[in-house]
Amino acid sequence: MKKIIKITIVSVFLILFLPVAAKALTIQIPKESSQIKIWFYLFIVTFFPAVELRGAIPLAVLLYKEPVLFSFILITIANILITPLIFLFWNLILFLAKKIKPFGIFFNKYIVGLQKRAKPLVDKYGFWGLLIFVAIPLPGTGAYSGALIAEIFGMNKWKAFFAVSLGVIGASIIVTLAVMGIIPLKIK
């Protein structure tokens, strides 16, 4: 009976969440839409783990033609808000990882990979290592990963929040400068 309940919960989650997430990432908001609707959309897009600020800033500036400074501020703040949410819901995340097998398998693999990538930096440099890890705007190095690393390594939450926040600001600066063409990107 418990297995049926678990399968039902996972199925309902996948049926409800995945189409919404896919739709949100591919939606084309008409140019004549209200400014608040576009800002809200950009704020929400920033909360998707695979996208975060690395995708939201180019989306804001290049597609929606939002002012660079405003986009930088809005998206940076949204991305910083992820860290306290991870800290707040850490026990729930662990509970779900134990109770929902597919989520648990994915989560455990992700955590093991994160530990391998972050351990040298965090062990050697602590606060600064976490900051540098988050500041590099590559997939898997954003606010989500930074907050998870802080939890995994048992870092002080205030210090970790500060490190992740500074890392997010650093990553936002790098991405914004790249979008503006100041930092040339060579994609092979």
Each model region followed by its residue ranges:
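N-terminal secretory/membrane targeting signals
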Residues: 1-24
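Interfacial loop-to-transmembrane junctions
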Residues: 3, 149-170
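Final/C-terminal transmembrane alpha-helix of multipass membrane proteins
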Residues: 9-17, 162-183
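Hydrophobic alpha-helical transmembrane segments of integral membrane proteins
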Residues: 15-16, 45-48, 54, 81, ...
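Membrane-interfacial helix-loop-helix
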Residues: 20-42, 66-134, 155-158, 165, ...
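Transmembrane helix boundary and interhelical junction motifs in multipass membrane proteins
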Residues: 47-60, 137-148
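Hydrophobic alpha-helical interface/terminus motif in multipass membrane transporters
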Residues: 60, 93, 149-150, 182
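Mid-bilayer segments of alpha-helical transmembrane spans in multi-pass integral membrane proteins
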Residues: 84, 135-140, 172-173
